[in-house]
């Protein structure tokens, strides 16, 4: 089965590598369990926090690593991802491999590893007040009815250089109140997320 999956991957011109952590609740005293970092499950009981990876378009599993519930997603993430990336077919050039990660993986060390090895990445940014201010003042353009995107450079605290960020927003009038409660607003706009990336794509394509 594994050989079949790798053969299917070999047919791809490019690859999107997704990775995420989930919580597996346990009962009893199994080895390696601990209260975890996954926000929705934190403090509910002992768990594992396995790290999974799959190809973003085909859904093909690329690998997994079973970890204790109190291990943060970004801890050891590069070692895991480096192994995953090394297993991709050699027919897919490094320049055509992109990695997508959520905010739990947002840190300078991991991003520097991607840049050093030449892999593309899109990582959801952790929202800080300085980033929000930069995001609010960026120049946005409409790419779909009610949707606007912007690209801007920003230097996070202690990161020592500028990185490219992409943000997406909608006028509040287009956004249901239920959605607005889970996002943040500024001057009649609801902001969905900001992402740091090294991809040379339009903001809407990154999003």
PLM features: what roles do these ranges have?
Residues 120-207:
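An anionic, glycine-rich sequence signature occurring as long contiguous blocks
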Residues 27-33, 38, 62-66, 108-114, ...:
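Short acidic, glycine/serine/threonine-rich loops at helix termini
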Residues 1-52:
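Active-site-proximal, Lys/Arg-enriched surface segment
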Residues 19-21, 52, 63-66, 101, ...:
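Glycine-rich, histidine-containing beta strand-loop boundary motifs that form or position
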Residues 37-92, 193:
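Electropositive, glycine- and tryptophan-enriched low-complexity nucleic-acid-binding patches
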Residues 13-24, 59, 97-106, 121, ...:
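Short, conserved catalytic/metal-binding motifs centered on acidic residues
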Residues 71-130:
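Domain-level cores of phosphate- or acyl-group-handling catalytic modules
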Residues 24-26, 60, 70-73, 104-109, ...:
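Flexible loop/turn segments at secondary-structure boundaries
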